[in-house]
């Protein structure tokens, strides 16, 4: 299991690392980065990728990178078309009602022990730290759009309206790696957790 509800992935490239889906909160994402650095060395973050517009996939971004590095162009942030609109609509406009419903779904008001809450189904549970957002610098706008990120070739495929209103998947040619976001999972979490 991970440090948070979602999983953060770190991809080692030619000069540094790309962080995919930096968790729910900055504090938890920073702990994840510290664990990585302790075991793999202090490679710089050169890119962040948001697979989709749900808060558990971007909320910890400021625990991973400094916004000044993004503004200077030192770090690029990639996201699918429609990301900002979907993130705002879901997490600000509908956020209060979704948060209340999530309490029933996750049982986060239960005491965390063997007879109470032992997890949220998808992962441990949502962290309670600072939710952050840094706007994307690079938008993936079409299927088959290729981007070279830190020496690796990413072949993107948009999947809007699949698991989230704005979502994407990709293939990294050099690593023969497929990233399927939350479109391929062991759960049907958007079906049984209607919020």
Q: What kind of region is each of these model predictions?
A:
Residues 27, 53-59, 84-86, 163-165, ...:
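Active-site environment of divalent metal-dependent phosphoester hydrolases
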Residues 35, 62-68, 92-99, 194-195:
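Short secondary-structure boundary/capping segments
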Residues 18-24, 48, 191-195:
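Second-shell loop/turn segments in exported
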Residues 153, 157-195:
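Active-site-proximal loop/helix segments of hydrolase catalytic cores
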Residues 78-80, 180:
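Generic beta-sheet signal
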Residues 85-159:
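Metallo-beta-lactamase
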Residues 15-16, 26-76:
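Active-site metal-binding motif and surrounding structural segment of the metallo-beta-lactamase
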Residues 1-43, 167-182:
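Conserved beta-strand hairpin/beta-sheet module of binuclear metal-dependent hydrolase folds
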